[in-house]
């Protein structure tokens, strides 16, 4: 997380205009920076059991996308700063605060995340990986906007794959009634099973379950597809995203079963 935040801060420092529209987004560079700051601050507060800042913006719905959209819009108003150079320092400060408050916590300790769902939670390790992933993926967005190189290593992509988020980000409209087992092979990384039972997803270690569809993916492409930054069709055409098994056609549907995390 520290390395990812440092990288994002360096990128923000290099951009003079916080009002620059981010490519493929409704946000500006300044708004993306503010979002990254609050993400770090909000989870640091959650680790300490405080939800006072975020609670007023949580709507009365259990739909992940609606809750997160409302909370994100509301919390952006709490941080009016949009100058990239100032936000760069705030990102570093907020990352350090999060690392400080979690330094003595076990990686499997649970932290509540009510902005995702009333009963939603992540492990401490999962929260840290999620925040690192946010730095990488939103840094990618900003870098694309200013034509700045932003290489993502296989190791980084493997570490920040948001496995704990998978059950939370199921799209109830597209997953309704769906029952199937998918085994995902992140090349050079983990193998895990996503089990759907009547539209409800769970993530399990791969241990010989009956599998309907195997998916093999380059971790970087998988990360960008999962976060909705690229279409699945390019990696499929290049052999970097493959499906096989008893029902290989289910692979084409897999991404659409989820909201972007």
Task: Locate each region found by the language model.
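Amphipathic alpha-helix face/heptad-repeat signature
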Residues: 1-4, 87-90, 94, 127, ...
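Short, Lys/Arg-rich amphipathic segments at extreme N-termini
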Residues: 1-22
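Amphipathic, well-ordered alpha-helical segments in soluble domains
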Residues: 4-11, 39, 94-97, 101-104, ...
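Short, contiguous alpha-helical
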Residues: 16-65, 114-173, 222
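Short, helix-capping/interhelical loops that line the mouth of catalytic, cofactor-
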Residues: 43-104, 108-110
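A glycine-rich beta-turn/hairpin centered on an aromatic-Pro dipeptide
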Residues: 157-198
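Acidic/His-leaning functional-site neighborhoods
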Residues: 190-214, 218
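C-terminal interaction segments
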Residues: 207-261
């Amino acid at each position: 997380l520290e390395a990812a935040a440092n990288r994002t801060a360096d990128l923000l420092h290099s951009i003079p205009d916080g009002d620059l529209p981010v490519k493929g987004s409704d946000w500006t560079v300044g708004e993306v920076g503010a979002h990254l700051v609050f993400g770090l601050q909000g989870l640091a507060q959650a680790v300490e059991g405080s939800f006072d800042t975020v609670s007023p913006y949580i709507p009365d719905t259990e739909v992940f996308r609606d809750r997160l959209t409302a909370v994100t819009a509301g919390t952006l108003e709490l941080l009016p700063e949009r100058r990239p150079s100032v936000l760069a320092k705030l990102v570093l400060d907020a990352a350090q605060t999060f690392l400080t408050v979690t330094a003595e916590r076990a990686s499997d300790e649970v932290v509540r995340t009510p902005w995702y769902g009333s009963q939603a939670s992540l492990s401490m390790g999962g929260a840290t990986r999620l925040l690192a992933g946010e730095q990488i993926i939103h840094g990618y967005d900003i870098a694309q906007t200013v034509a700045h190189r932003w290489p993502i290593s296989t190791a980084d992509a493997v570490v920040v794959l948001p496995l704990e988020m998978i059950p939370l980000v199921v799209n109830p409209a597209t997953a309704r009634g769906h029952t199937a087992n998918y085994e995902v092979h992140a090349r050079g990384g983990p193998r895990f099973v996503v089990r759907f039972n009547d539209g409800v997803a769970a993530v399990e270690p791969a241990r010989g379950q009956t599998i309907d569809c195997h998916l093999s993916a380059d971790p970087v492409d998988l990360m960008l597809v999962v976060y909705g930054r690229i279409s699945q069709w390019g990696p499929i055409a290049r052999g970097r995203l493959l499906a096989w098994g008893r029902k290989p056609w289910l692979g084409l549907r897999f991404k659409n079963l989820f909201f972007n995390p």
